[in-house]
Amino acid sequence: MFVSFEGIDGCGKSTQVNLLVNYLEEKGIPYIKVREPGGTHLGEKIRELLITQEMCARSELLLFLASRAQLVESVIKPALKNGKIVIADRFAHSSVAYQGCGRELGPETVKILNDFATDKTYPDIVFYIDVPVNVAMERMKNQHKDRIEKEGKEFWESIRNCYLKMAKENENFVIIDGTRTIEEIHREIVKVFNAYL
């Protein structure tokens, strides 16, 4: 099974990834946790470029896709083949939202490129943790921000709207209200996850 977590920065996604991983550990369920960009030697080098270097939107997208392609071939496909559950802190839907909508490269264009980069390997479940942009921005106000996280409210609204549209169009999306407590969110995620097992 392949599970990804999506949402705008500040939604609490990474916290929930770690809680689900802890749950799998406790249950003795074999898994692998990956993050995007990154998760491989090449991916981590690309991550550093994406976070620190100024670049045009197309370059940004192509770097994300390169990292993703390597992650799928080197880590995700082998893990799935070996019966492990893959837990991804972001995956292909992030590019549709961030580069397709936020950077205005077009969601359909990004979807086509994602198909190529992932060899059409997609999550069985996408937990989309939804929070209003002002809530996410408030949560992040005292954190060090990378190049992308420094974008303005309009950028984040576009991304959130894109995620909500994808959630309506894809049966494997599960919308999670990210304004609730960490524990409430975790309980809902575990309940949905167990229903898929």
UniProtKB/Swiss-Prot annotation:
GO terms for biological process: dTDP biosynthetic process; dTTP biosynthetic process; dUDP biosynthetic process. GO terms for cellular component: cytosol. ATP binds at G7, I8, D9, G10, C11, G12, K13, S14. It catalyses: dTMP + ATP = dTDP + ADP. GO terms for molecular function: ATP binding; dTMP kinase activity. It is an enzyme of class 2 (transferase). Keywords: ATP-binding, Kinase, Nucleotide biosynthesis, Nucleotide-binding, Transferase. The keyword Kinase applies. Pfam families: Thymidylate_kin (PF02223). InterPro entries: P-loop_NTPase, Thymidylate_kin-like_dom, Thymidylate_kinase. Its EC number is 2.7.4.9. Phosphorylation of dTMP to form dTDP in both de novo and salvage pathways of dTTP synthesis. Belongs to the thymidylate kinase family. This is Thymidylate kinase. The gene is tmk.
